[in-house]
UniProtKB/Swiss-Prot annotation:
[4Fe-4S] cluster binds at C270, C273, C305, E312. Its EC number is 1.17.7.3. Belongs to the IspG family. This is 4-hydroxy-3-methylbut-2-en-1-yl diphosphate synthase (flavodoxin). PANTHER family: 4-HYDROXY-3-METHYLBUT-2-EN-1-YL DIPHOSPHATE SYNTHASE, 4-HYDROXY-3-METHYLBUT-2-EN-1-YL DIPHOSPHATE SYNTHASE (FERREDOXIN), CHLOROPLASTIC. The keyword Iron-sulfur applies. Converts 2C-methyl-D-erythritol 2,4-cyclodiphosphate (ME-2,4cPP) into 1-hydroxy-2-methyl-2-(E)-butenyl 4-diphosphate. It is an enzyme of class 1 (oxidoreductase). Pathway: Isoprenoid biosynthesis; isopentenyl diphosphate biosynthesis via DXP pathway; isopentenyl diphosphate from 1-deoxy-D-xylulose 5-phosphate: step 5/6. Keywords: 4Fe-4S, Iron, Iron-sulfur, Isoprene biosynthesis, Metal-binding, Oxidoreductase. GO terms for molecular function: 4 iron, 4 sulfur cluster binding; 4-hydroxy-3-methylbut-2-en-1-yl diphosphate synthase activity (ferredoxin); 4-hydroxy-3-methylbut-2-enyl-diphosphate synthase activity (flavodoxin); iron ion binding. The gene is ispG.
Amino acid sequence: MHIESPIKRRQSTRIYVGNVPIGDGAPIAVQSMTNTRTTDVDATVAQIKSLEKVGADIVRVSVPTMDAAEAFKVIKQQVSVPLVADIHFDYRIALQVAEYGVDCLRINPGNIGNEQRIRSVVDCARDKNIPIRIGVNGGSLEKDIQAKYKEPTAEALLESAMRHVDILDRLNFDQFKVSVKASDVFLAVDSYRLLAKQIAQPLHLGITEAGGARAGSVKSAVGLGMLLSEGIGDTLRISLAADPVEEIKVGFDILKSLRIRSRGINFIACPTCSRQEFDVIATVNELEQRLEDLITPMDVSLIGCVVNGPGEAEVSHMGIAGSNRKSAFYEDGVRQKERFDNDNIVDQLEAKIRAKAATLSKENQIDINQID
């Protein structure tokens, strides 16, 4: 029912984004980014709350102007999830949002001005205990690095990242995490592998500009799956041209599939064939929607016939093995006397799952921030 992940995670230092621990064995944090106009406070707050509802640990907000910084102040007062301010070029914006309680600054020290300006931001972050995320992207490398390498390479992304890391090192600031994102899976993976050998700080994973919901999810799962399976990564974002809520769902699904961090129901369902005795596809789709609010980790198997049904059910918290008119029901791997009417499986199983989740939650005192 619960198989421990065989993955041994890379040892890293620990930082905190608000109250969320990052690195040094902490649960891998799942985050997203708002796509509203930050100056539209109501829309931005609503989106942040929708992200928090589906489990977002951290939310990033773009703050491109001083007007956006003023809006950020109001937004921060209305939400509880830790917020990262995404800032480029203007160091004054970083100083301003620091005064407004930002939980993390996403800046690249090398692009916010001269040494004095960089030092002022870093000193402010140190004084207020605000971590920094260095964010390198294959599509926006420094001009001299572009000229040197001609095209984005793993070595180019690493050089860019280390340039910013060296700045923070010179200023004796070690409360930071780093990302080296690229839209190409192999480029991103190779870049993170190189970086993981160079620094001890936490790594923020992502395949940038991955695409739409379907293709982007697949690309992210492949790239991040490779890295996570090697123990690389302390926090992640799935970058989709889609509703940011989907980014959180996909992020947790990737972690769940690797048994790294589980949230909610893990459905094991057959692709169906002519042997199915109940409508598996409709059942899975309906239950996924109805049970989105559950955070308790559970394995639920929905198999349409008795070929694989009993075997899957025996290693699940709950399971259905399809049979004629009434299907067999399993709980904790044991077949129950009760059988489910094939025409009413969804309602019956939802009630059973909710009751089981409540029991497990009470027994284990489930705190989603500690599920790892």
